[in-house]
Amino acid sequence: MVHAPARSEDIREEVAELLGVDVDAVQPGSNLIGQGLDSIRIMTLAGRWRRRGIAVDFATLAETPTIEAWAQLVTAGRQDTDSAAPPADSSGDPSGETEPFALAPMQHAMWVGRQDNQQLGGVAGHLYVEFDAGLLDSGRLRAAATALARRHPMLRVRFLPDGTQCITPAVECGDFPVHVEDLRELGTDEVERRLTALREAKSHQQLDGAVFELTVTLLPGGRSRLHVDLDMQAADAMSYRTLMADLAALYRGCDLPELSYTYRQYRHAVEAQDAQPQPRRDADRDWWARRLPELPDPPALPITAGRGANRSTRRWHWLDPQTRDALFARAQARGITPAMALAAGFANTLARWSSNSRFLLNVPLFGRQPLHPDVDALVGDFTSSLLLDVDLVGAHTAAARAQVVQDAMRTAAAHSAYSGLSVLRDLSRHRGTQVLAPVVFTSALGLGELFSPEVTGQFGTPAWIISQGPQVLLDAQVTEFDGGVLVNWDVREGFFPPGVIDAMFAYHIDELLRLASADDAWDAPGPAALPEAQRAVREAINGRTAPPSGEALHDRFFRQAERQPDAPAVFAGSGDLSYAQLRDQALAVAAALRAAGAGAGDTVAVVGPKSAEQIPAVLGILSVGAAYLPIGADQPRDRAERILQSGRVRLALVCGGRQLSLPVPGLVLADVLGGAPADAEIACARVDPGELAYVLFTSGSTGEPKGVEVTHDAAMNTVEFIGRHFEIGPADRCLALSTLEGDISVMDVFVTLRTGGAIVVVDEAQRRDPDAWARLIDTHRVTVLHFMPGWLEMLVEVGRGRLSSVRVVPTGGDWVRPEVVRRLRAEAPGLRFAGLGGATETPVHNTIFEVTEPIPADWTALPFGVPLPNNVCRVVGDTGGDCPEWVPGELWVSGRGIARGYRGRPDLTAQRFVEHDGRTSYRTGDLVRYRPDGTLEFVGRADHRVKISGYRVELGEIESALRRVPGVRTAVAALIAGAGESDVLAAQVGTDDPALTGEQVRQYLADLVPAHMIPRHVAVVERIGFTAAGKLDRRAVARELHSVVGQSHSPGHRAASTPLEGALALILGDLLGRDDVGVDDDFFALGGDSVLATQAVARIRAWLDAPDVMVADMFANRTVSALAAVLRAAEDDPDRLDHVAELYLEVIGMDAESVLTATRQTTKS
């Protein structure tokens, strides 16, 4: 028995041994982190001492890292009652060495995760290495490998379908196969081609039956390449080092000491130990349980839609000894261990490329309990894991980030008696869906060189290394190599957009080199995550400028009226107007306003139904230097009065020919238009472009409308661009559908009139009638449509044969389906179509994407495009930095085209209009991302970001995936309050396919998004309605979905209707600890996990005589009804299982005496 350290000197000796230094180099009062002790080795000591009966933990040791402090902690912690229990029997059962035994927790996770139906599954835990050597003797290597397989039973392991493993006796295995590829007679190019093909085949294979494979390629010039492939379900990374060291020794002809202990015995002893009372483990489990509701998601890295390729790729960089020493010394001077310095650099890179800067990081641990002297020489899986809750939101320097990560490591390690894998299973049960931690940081610092001199001496230098693991996206590894540190990333690259991993890795390495080079780099803000090439693209597309005209919105109209007085300006059902007539009406409005005391700096409301008379009203208001504020006819009276008051309205012009009772003075517009016009010189009076032009009230999140103040110059940036870009002129006719309250009306009125075109007015009676729009387009040969996407959807449904005159369609404000573009161009060949992004606060548009080429078939919506001239668009992450390509963040717009702020709301203005780098930016609340070509892509709205099963999810991302389902035109996702349960994700889709079902949509989504993003309910309708503003009517959809969800819960769960369903419900309910499992209930949503699924399969096989059922069946068929259907389908006689289930149900209902009596009767018969 190993005794606990009793003196400081004993502790010094243990620390010196771990550091690989002389004991005199370890000073009692010195900071051990500064002397090279890292987190992993502190954890090793903590675990070692706890097993010796000393109550210490990693966090306490790490907080006071000196020999003197540790001696006091060890003395005080000797009476640990947790470890005072009698030690578990470590001998195991050697006589049963070939009997099946349970998988270790990490083995089980890999066994389940490698199945194709798992998230990020379909691959094995796998390590592949190539060594370049001289001429290897394949016969000697075969003999060495045969001896190696006899020495290590886990090289002869078989993984059984029931989730157990067993060892094949050595006598049944024969010689270990060593494959030989002879390429000595081939030319250089062919040799390289064959080596590449061999690497491609072996580096991603799933070994079938074998867990260890050796291949020797004989090369020209007396050279060889050794290919080593290991299934890591059989042996972890530390075991790989043991295997290669033993293989090298056996190849040299050395005799290795016999092992008197096996991995199977070790697992037996650990399980026996785990079965004993474990107060520390129970306390740590309770600690994690309290934290489950607040644990974050994994890093939300940019992932491509659909299922990516299973192949892994590697990025690597070698930090030479000088760089390593400088980096580690600077870290240790700040009390940061080397491993945590490297982990912090990795975490910072993740935060820069993630839409969440607080995330879960998976940290594997290599730890073997000292249950036998031979434990360190064994091969098997000894790994566990920690989950780190990393929060870098407020950490703006490298030193701060390193401290955050180190603190997170200490916190997790202080509660490591309950493993990270167990926490993930609990978190999955808590959220009702499978939770993964697919981003991994693996530190092998302190474990010695990756390949010992003995290994490289026999087999040569490593030429290629790659690993992969099931349910892992990115595994960052740091290990000691060739005197320095090797930094590797093994990545499932097919899941990421092109270029993302290269940019991330380059940023990571650049930061490590920067921190190694200078002390002040630790205390300065980190560099922006934008690689130079990305920065150049951003600067180019944001650097486009166009000289402003210096005009107010109405100026050019009055000049056009002088130039072409008889040209048509307005076509309306109430009567057409020439430019001269429209000018006179506008001046009549101006005269009436002046007579009423309204002028420069005032705000005048335009109240009432949409009509042609509103056009001279706004022109007259602007001509006297006032700003207009529209209030439509469908505004509730209370809301209209609040707008008039908060809008500080001086006077109201009332449309529709009738006086209203208003809280402000009012003039009937029909009366005003017939009055005498003001002096002509008023049309030439200069209004400063910096003055307000209009105030538009939009819905506020608090329920109180907010008034956006827009200057002439801000609006003119878009007006001038649209007119110039689309070459709009006197021959054009614009159909004005938008009400004045919608900012698209600014385009309808001012783009058209400043360029000499004519406005075709859609009045109040027509604005909800798409057929009327089509008639007006056809009658007046309309050429320009400033339409919302929803209006276009309605128009193409009814406009066939009547849209040929249309030549320009700028649209925006909602998702724009490519199909709309195709249908419009079928009606109007040569049509110029553009999707534009924008907001009332960035009047009217801030980006443009003109469709000039065929739209790719996989696009579900048009992107926002590139910024308009004089605008700058930033995509900002939650740390305040610019997001790299493909990473979503909030769109911030600055430049000429932004509003002044919110009327009477300085608090809201300060919140949304922020100062940054000397300029004012408007925070749009739109979630967007930059593509590599500088195109902005709309992802969703920040206010559509919801929590689903504990995950933060963009509803827009779900809607985008829904639109990828064949047959789906439009989609709206919503979070609906469930009946007596947590909120439910639901969706409504519009389709032309009458055969499409909600379940089919859900099944298709399984290949596009994770399980937690698949709506529980999908309602299929012929079409989703639009609001009067031309946007998808989300409120109406939410009401309909609420009804659907409520109806689905009202009857309660469906009970079993057959004996088989009853038996399955009973088996699953027993494992879940509940007696109310319905046949449609999701096993995993009720708290099931991979371990319980394995147990369920074992019981179903044994108790229902269904030997072919697999764990994969449980994951693919998550309900009792679905599982019963699969079991029946596999039977020649589908009724047989019901008979077996009847017997099971009968037996399970008997007491012990009844079972014994029945058994005796059966035996006699």
Curated annotation (Swiss-Prot):
Role summary: Involved in the initial steps of the mycobactin biosynthetic pathway. Putatively couples activated salicylic acid with serine or threonine and cyclizes this precursor to the hydroxyphenyloxazoline ring system present in this class of siderophores.
Database matches in InterPro entries: AA_adenyl_dom, AB_hydrolase_fold, ACP-like_sf, AMP-bd_C_sf, AMP-binding_CS, AMP-dep_synth/lig_dom, ANL_N_sf, CAT-like_dom_sf
Homology family: Belongs to the ATP-dependent AMP-binding enzyme family. MbtB subfamily.
Cofactor: pantetheine 4'-phosphate
Pathway(s) of this molecule: Siderophore biosynthesis; mycobactin biosynthesis
GO cellular component annotations of the record: cytoplasm
Lineage, uppermost ranks: Bacteria, Bacillati, Actinomycetota, Actinomycetes, Mycobacteriales
Group of enzyme by EC: ligase
Gene Ontology BP terms: amino acid activation for nonribosomal peptide biosynthetic process; lipid biosynthetic process; secondary metabolite biosynthetic process
Record GO terms (molecular function): ligase activity; phosphopantetheine binding
Name of the coding gene: mbtB
Domain Carrier: 5-78, 1055-1131
UniProt keyword terms in alphabetical order: Ligase, Multifunctional enzyme, Phosphopantetheine, Phosphoprotein, Repeat
Cofactor note as given: Binds 2 phosphopantetheines covalently.
Protein name as annotated: Phenyloxazoline synthase MbtB
EC number: 6.3.2.-
Stretches for region Disordered: 77-100
Region (Adenylation) residue spans: 578-973
